[in-house]
Amino acid sequence: GAEKAARMEPYTTLKPLGSDNPRDLWKWLQGYQEKTGGHVLAIAHNGNLSNGIMFPIVESFTGKEIALEYAQTRSRWEPLYEVTQIKGDGEAHPFLSPNDEFADYETWDQGNLDLSVPKKNDMLRYEYARSALQIGLEMEKRLGVNPYKFGMIGSTDSHTALATAGEDNFFGKHSGAEPGPKRWEHPMAQVGDKKYEGWSMVSSGYAAVWAKENTRAAIFDAMMRKETYATTGPRMIVRFFGGWDFNEKDAQNRLPA
């Protein structure tokens, strides 16, 4: 509760109090666990507006090729990835998957979050989940550890604190625009003639977790196991198994976890 939280100052990326280097975030997470005895994980934000820095092969803060220690630390603290949300879908891009007609779902590829830096095609491979999984396998061959072996979730990222993504209970998209007849065209960000208009924002998605019971501890454990998946709205039940020792009964088993 509050007593535990008071032992740590909240992490911030704003300098000089904070840092936008992911290594410093990982150190903070480690410190939280050591000081409070609690358990934490980080879920990486949808990287489709990262302009190629979400899944790097070279550390942006050092300019050096990612090495074993970075791969181990990232895989430890970031088991999950937000693959879809209000600001576009981050699974695949038509430039990377030209033969997949589903790869152009809710594509946001004008630039970074505030549109101050335009998007270039050579950035795309390092910010979409499908190509990141491939990069992770390539890095595992070199390092023995895969930093991008993540589970996936979806979320709204609408900043409203409301669970209202369903059509029967929809309160609107981003909190930056008040309800009104012109909200559909209100830009979330704009630089010159480039802008993210209100109508272009997505209303999905959802995070699904296979947990043994509906408790915080069980849900946290399931997330650490990566027994999760993302949807863009439908509340579908999906399970995927990979291995050699399953039988036909396992395919029909609806028991979670």
Labelled PLM ranges:
Residues 1-257:
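Extended, charged catalytic domains and RNA/DNA-binding interfaces, predominantly
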